Each structure stands twice: as structure tokens, then as C-alpha cells.
């Protein structure tokens, strides 16, 4: 049976179909918004997974190129690994859904969102969050409540819900708000230095717009939703819990109140070892329960410390930033480096400048086709003092890199202002919370050190939240460290400049957070950001006047677009010859902009000279210094500009009669010639005789 329900959201139809497709999935839906369609399938294992201490949720966001009428490139002509954008979209869906499953739920759950049709005016990533929530609500899988997502744009101080492609180009804000009926669940934002008050208002606007989609989901559940399963939830053995608490409660409290991180961790390890020695034999098959009890005891102590004792694990005030350190110019051969330290968190970012042609080409369903500014983030095991295999970037690393990239993107100069491709790599050297925002600070240092004329320096900070069990008490924390992140309820990352916010990313372990938290976190983040920006300014107050000696020197010239073929030549013969002879990189745009790059400045000058010669028009009456390239019985061919030759007839070689061309010139000679005529076929006639006569007349006038 096919169940169909539709509603109007921001002037467009949102529709869900349930029961027609994917009959063997727990729930499968087609959900559309305009002509963008997401196929969502959700399934769960019948029994909990044994021996784990986490909820095994898997969210997959699958892009199909047929959705935009494309055939994949490459030899095999099929989709390969998910793109970075697909990974980021999958993470956004995951972060929105995860807190809404029951605590202690250990069944494997998989949510697969497949993008099957895309209309550029309606973003599939926004629809995917709504589609995933709808499918879970309609399924029998335990899921607390509907959650909705909208995108908010800002044009001329007016908020726009789910802006179309044209509006997204004009908008200075790109905000995604996910919310339940009562609380905000997740926030993603990028903006052109948006003032705090406007950002808060935009989030409230997005929350209100989410309510229509939540009502739509609730209506669908009433009409054709499945009855929910009663799950088997993980609970700790009561006897284990009682014994461990009686034995270790005082020791845990004493250890957690140690302010030094290393000493605290050592004390906790000692408690764990004592517990193992005391109860290892008695509860040899209950190590999972013991681990859970110890975790809950530590969490309770930290939360009591923050909410009741009003003190933080390291002794700081709630709005205090850890000690800061900034340094630039660490590495001798790189184009720019920045070392940023905040407490025990330390990130080194390296900037590399490349030619315009070094841009990243994107092959996917996204509107963007290329990127000239990119940020990569590496988080090795040694950053937390652990031994781990070094593999490629995981989802978390891709997500943190994209977040830092988004924070600086509005501040990067245009290609016209700064004709370089820019790559940043952040190496996390030490991690004790908020490495993504430390990467923003390190990136600012590296870009300024590299001579990139940023609009303004940027900095980032991570805010946290601790709440009581009944949510009656809330405490926002500035610059959270690892222990506060681990045992806390929220990670609220804010980056920006002195003028406003450039990026936000928020996720929570709760079933949402209040607007009071949003306002306090954003306003406290600004205070912290100003402190960090002052420290950055003390280290380096403006971009270097020149790029590094080891960076490519790029110069731009403008040529007539009709002359581009003259520079490229048949099959690229001419441009490849220039590149080979001068050692430069040449990139040509359709509008006639030519970018010439090389670490050898002389090579750049030589290449530009050749290109200007190739595109310069030969004019009758002008005098050129040319090189003899060929001799015949009737004259000499002379190259006056690159790839442009003319004929000096034997009668035009000298003032006197010439019997043999070789008597006057030889191949390779440089001579001054005058253009006497360009005939209808474009052939150039030259005269050395006219130049000599002009010189003679000039000398005679000077003698008089």
C-alpha cells in the first residue's frame, strides 16, 4: 500500500511516500521537496550487540550522479568512495539523530539516505535530515520524537527560509537549524562576519520554521506510522554498581578534583587498577558493567563540581580562556607557518601557495565545480599520547578540516586581489579539547605569515554546557577542555573576527538545548574571541608585505579573448613551448586573464614578454627589432614578434642596390625593420631601407 502525504513548506511542496518501496526495510520512504528527492531506508538488528559500550548507529549519505544527469568519470564509470561533501552531510544527519535514541540502546541501526534526484534550488542535505527523521518516526525503531531542518539565508537584512540557488549566491549567511518541537538540536553556519544579535535572531527564525515540518511528520506518524518496538536497554548489574560505588566513590572524587591533567589521569588509572584487583575475579564476566559504573561516577563528580561547587576541573573561571601562545615562521622552506597553543591543545598550520591552475576540481552533485582555497586537518594518535596506526583521514578529520575552512573562507581575498591557490594543513600536535578551533587560529597565523591579505584575522573557540538531570540548571563553559567535552552535554564551536561570526557548529548529547544556552554561548564566545585575537595581533598584526621567497611569483596580464588561440597554438604547441623554455605555469581564463606563475621571477618576465608579443597586433608604419630566420634569393624573412614573420624584399634591404641577400644579412642577425604593408591575406611586408632612410633624414635635420 502506498501512503502519500504532502504539505507546503516555504511555498514549495514537501511530500513523503511510504509503503510503496523497500518493502523489506523496517521503513523506506521517498521524500521530495520540489524536484529534489531522497530515498531513505532505516533498519535495526533484532537483538542488542554484546560487549560494546556505545550506540552502534551508522548513517550513510549516498550521492548518485544520475540525480543530476551525470555519468561518473574515470575508467569504471560508477560512483566510488563518497565525496567530502557527502561525508559532511552524513555527519550532519548523524549528529542530529543520535541523541534522540533511548539511552542504553545497543541494537545496530543503519540509516541510508540516497540522493536520487536533485533540483539546484532545493538542497538535498537539508531534505536528508528531514527524510531520515521521517523514516525513523514511521518505523518501529525506538526514536524519541520528530526533528526537522531548514536552511536560513540573509539578504538585505531579511531572513529567507530554504533559499533557492540565486538567493544562496546573494546571501551573506548560510545557516542550518535542526530542532524538535521544544528545543534546538543542531546548528551549522557559515557567514560573512554576521553580528551576534543577527545570528541569534536567525537561529530563532529557523527554529520557528522547523515547526511546520515537525507537524508534517507528526501527521504522517498518526496516519501510517508503525507501532514502536519495546527495546532491551543496557543496564548495569545492580550488585556490581553497589560494590564499585562503595569501594571507589571516595577515591574517584579525590582523583577528579586534581587540577593537573596528567596527575588526574594517573590517579584515575590507579583507581581503575585497584577496582580490577578487587573485583576482577568476582565479576570477571562483568567488565563492561564495571567500566560503565566508573564512567558514570566520574561524570557525576565532574557535573557536581561544575554545577554545585561552581569550579572547573583545572580551576579556571567559567568564562576564562586557557593560557595562549602564538608563533609564526617556524619552518624555513614553507610559505607560511603558524603555531597556536591553548593550554594543552596545540596546532601547527602550514600554508602553501600555488598557481591558479592548482585548484581542486570537484566531481559530484554539488553546485561548486572547483576550490582555490582548501583546509586539511590531521589528528594523529601521538596528539593524545597514544599509539595508533597512521591511516588516511577519517570522517572526523574531514569534518574538522571543513569547519576550519568555512571559518576563514569569507576572509580569503579574491583571485583578482591575490592570484594564488591556497592550501592549509593543520597538524594537531597535542589535543586537550577544541582542536578544530585551534586550527582556525593557527590558520590565521599561517596565512598572515604567508603574506595572504586576509580581510581580517579570525579566531575560534569551543563553548560547552553542563546541565542537571531535570534540566533545571544550566552552566555554559568557555574554552572547554577534553574532560569537560567528554562528560559535558554540548560542543558549541564559534569562529569569527572582531566584526562578527564566520562559522558555527553545534551538537549535543541531550535531546536539544534552550535558546538561553544559544544566546549565552554566542555572547560569551565573542568575549573569548576578542582575547584570542589580541594575542594573535601581538604575534603578527598584518600580512607579510611579500610572499615567501620559495612561493611562486604570480603576475596577471589581460589579453584579447580572441587571441587566446594564438597563445595556446595548435594542440597546445605554443603554450607548451613557452612553459618548457621559461619553466613557468600558465593558466588562461575565458575572459582573457592570463596568470603566469614561477618561483623564478625572470622566467615569469620572459613568459609575459612572449605572451604579449604573441597577442600584440602588428601595425603598419611601426619599427621593430627583428631576427632573420630565413634567407632566399628574393629577400629575408624576419621574425618581428613571437610567431609573426614578415618579408624584407631584396630591394628593401639597403639604401644601395643589393646583388645578394647574404651580402647584407645572415640568419640570426637582429635588424631594425619597418612595417610597410599588411596585405589582405595578412602577410607582412618589411623594409630595412626605410629605417635607414628615416635615420639619415633625422641626422640631416639635426646637423642643420
UniProtKB/Swiss-Prot annotation:
Spans through the membrane: none
Entry's Gene Ontology molecular function annotations: 3'-5'-RNA exonuclease activity; magnesium ion binding; polyribonucleotide nucleotidyltransferase activity; RNA binding
Domain S1 motif: 621-689
Domain called KH: residue spans: 552-611
Positions contributing to Mg(2+) binding: 485, 491
Localization of this protein: Cytoplasm
GO biological process, one term: RNA processing
Names of the cofactor(s): Mg(2+)
Catalytic reaction(s) noted: RNA(n+1) + phosphate = RNA(n) + a ribonucleoside 5'-diphosphate
Phosphoprotein found in the keyword field: no
SUPFAM superfamilies: Eukaryotic type KH-domain (KH-domain type I), Nucleic acid-binding proteins, Polynucleotide phosphorylase/guanosine pentaphosphate synthase (PNPase/GPSI), domain 3, Ribonuclease PH domain 2-like, Ribosomal protein S5 domain 2-like
Record-listed E.C. numbers: 2.7.7.8
Keywords, in A-Z order: Cytoplasm, Magnesium, Metal-binding, Nucleotidyltransferase, RNA-binding, Transferase
A single cellular component GO annotation: cytosol
Coiled coil: none
Family as reported in the entry's similarity comment: Belongs to the polyribonucleotide nucleotidyltransferase family.
NCBIfam families: polynuc_phos, PRK11824.1
Annotated function: Involved in mRNA degradation. Catalyzes the phosphorolysis of single-stranded polyribonucleotides processively in the 3'- to 5'-direction.
Protein name in the entry: Polyribonucleotide nucleotidyltransferase
Organism: Clostridium botulinum (strain Alaska E43 / Type E3)
Chain's gene name: pnp
Amino acid at each position: 500500500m502506498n501512503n502519500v502525504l504532502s504539505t507546503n513548506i516555504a511555498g514549495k511542496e514537501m511530500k513523503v511516500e511510504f509503503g510503496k518501496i523497500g518493502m523489506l526495510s523496517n521503513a523506506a520512504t521517498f521524500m521530495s521537496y520540489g524536484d529534489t528527492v531522497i530515498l531513505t531506508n532505516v533498519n535495526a538488528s533484532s537483538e542488542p550487540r554484546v560487549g560494546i559500550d556505545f550506540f552502534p548507529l551508522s548513517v550513510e549519505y549516498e550521492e548518485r550522479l544520475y540525480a543530476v544527469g551525470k555519468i561518473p568519470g574515470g575508467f569504471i564509470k560508477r560512483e566510488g568512495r563518497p565525496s567530502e561533501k557527502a561525508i559532511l552531510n552524513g555527519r550532519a544527519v548523524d549528529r542530529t539523530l543520535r541523541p534522540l535514541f533511548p539511552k542504553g540502546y545497543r541494537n545496530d541501526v543503519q540509516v541510508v539516505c540516497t540522493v536520487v534526484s536533485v533540483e539546484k534550488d532545493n538542497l538535498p542535505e537539508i531534505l536528508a535530515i528531514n527524510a531520515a527523521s521521517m523514516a525513523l518516526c514511521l518505523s518501529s525503531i525506538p526514536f524519541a520524537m520528530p526533528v526537522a531542518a531548514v536552511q536560513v539565508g540573509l539578504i538585505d537584512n531579511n531572513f529567507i527560509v530554504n533559499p533557492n540557488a540565486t538567493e544562496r549566491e546573494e546571501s551573506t549567511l548560510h545557516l542550518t537549524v535542526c530542532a524538535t518541537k521544544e528545543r534546538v538540536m543542531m546548528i551549522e553556519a557559515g557567514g560573512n562576519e554576521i553580528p551576534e544579535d543577527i545570528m541569534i535572531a536567525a537561529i530563532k527564525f529557523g527554529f520557528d520554521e522547523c515547526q511546520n515540518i515537525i507537524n508534517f511528520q507528526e501527521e504522517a506518524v498518526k496516519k501510517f506510522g508503525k507501532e514502536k518496538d519495546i527495546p532491551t536497554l543496557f543496564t548495569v548489574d545492580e550488585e556490581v554498581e553497589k560494590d564499585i560505588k562503595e569501594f571507589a566513590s571516595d577515591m574517584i572524587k579525590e582523583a577528579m578534583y586534581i587540577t593537573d591533567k596528567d596527575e588526574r589521569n594517573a590517579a584515575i588509572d590507579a583507581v581503575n587498577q585497584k577496582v580490577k584487583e578487587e573485583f576482577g575475579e568476582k565479576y570477571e564476566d562483568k567488565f563492561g558493567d564495571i567500566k560503565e559504573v566508573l564512567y558514570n561516577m566520574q561524570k557525576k563528580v565532574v557535573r557536581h563540581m561544575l554545577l554545585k561547587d561552581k569550579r572547573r576541573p583545572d580551576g579556571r573561571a567559567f568564562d576564562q580562556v586557557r593560557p595562549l601562545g602564538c608563533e609564526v615562521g617556524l619552518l624555513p622552506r614553507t610559505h607560511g607557518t603558524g603555531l597556536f597553543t591553548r593550554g594543552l591543545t596545540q596546532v601547527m598550520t602550514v600554508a602553501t601557495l600555488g598557481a591558479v591552475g592548482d585548484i581542486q576540481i570537484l566531481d559530484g552533485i554539488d553546485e561548486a565545480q572547483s576550490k582555490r582555497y582548501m583546509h586539511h586537518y590531521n589528528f594523529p594518535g601521538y596528539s593524545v599520547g597514544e599509539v595508533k596506526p597512521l591511516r588516511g583521514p577519517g570522517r572526523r578529520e574531514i569534518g574538522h578540516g571543513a569547519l576550519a575552512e568555512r571559518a576563514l573562507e569569507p576572509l580569503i581575498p579574491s583571485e583578482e586581489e591575490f592570484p594564488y591557490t591556497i592550501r592549509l594543513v593543520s597538524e594537531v600536535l597535542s589535543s586537550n579539547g577544541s582542536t578544530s578551533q585551534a586550527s582556525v587560529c593557527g590558520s590565521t597565523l599561517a596565512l598572515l605569515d604567508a603574506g595572504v591579505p586576509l580581510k581580517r584575522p579570525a579566531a575560534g573557540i569551543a563553548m560547552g554546557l553542563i546541565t542537571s538531570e531535570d534540566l533545571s540548571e544550566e552552566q555554559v563553559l568557555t574554552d572547554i577542555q577534553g574532560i569537560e567535552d567528554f562528560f559535558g552535554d554540548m560542543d558549541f564551536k564559534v569562529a569569527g573576527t572582531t566584526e562578527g561570526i564566520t562559522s558555527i557548529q553545534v551538537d549535543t548529547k541531550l535531546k536539544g538545548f534552550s535558546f538561553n544556552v544559544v544566546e549565552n554561548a554566542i555572547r560569551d564566545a565573542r568575549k573569548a574571541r576578542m582575547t584570542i585575537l589580541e594575542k594573535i595581533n601581538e604575534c603578527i598584526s598584518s600580512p607579510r608585505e611579500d610572499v615567501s621567497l620559495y612561493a611562486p611569483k604570480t603576475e596577471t596580464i589581460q589579453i584579447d579573448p580572441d587571441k587566446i588561440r594564438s597563445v595556446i597554438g595548435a594542440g597546445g604547441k605554443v603554450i607548451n613551448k613557452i612553459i618548457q623554455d621559461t619553466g613557468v605555469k600558465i593558466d588562461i581564463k575565458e575572459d582573457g586573464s592570463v596568470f603566469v606563475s614561477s618561483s623564478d621571477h625572470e622566467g615569469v618576465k620572459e613568459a609575459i614578454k612572449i605572451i604579449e608579443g604573441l597577442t600584440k597586433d602588428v601595425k603598419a608604419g611601426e619599427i621593430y627589432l627583428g631576427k632573420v630566420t630565413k634567407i632566399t634569393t628574393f629577400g629575408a624573412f624576419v621574425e618581428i614578434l613571437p610567431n609573426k614573420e614578415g618579408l624584407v624584399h631584396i630591394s628593401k634591404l639597403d639604401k644601395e642596390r643589393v646583388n645578394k641577400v647574404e651580402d647584407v644579412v645572415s640568419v640570426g642577425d637582429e635588424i631594425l625593420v619597418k612595417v610597410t604593408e599588411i596585405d589582405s591575406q595578412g602577410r607582412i611586408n618589411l623594409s630595412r631601407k626605410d629605417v635607414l632612410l628615416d635615420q639619415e633624414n633625422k641626422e640631416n635635420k639635426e646637423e642643420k
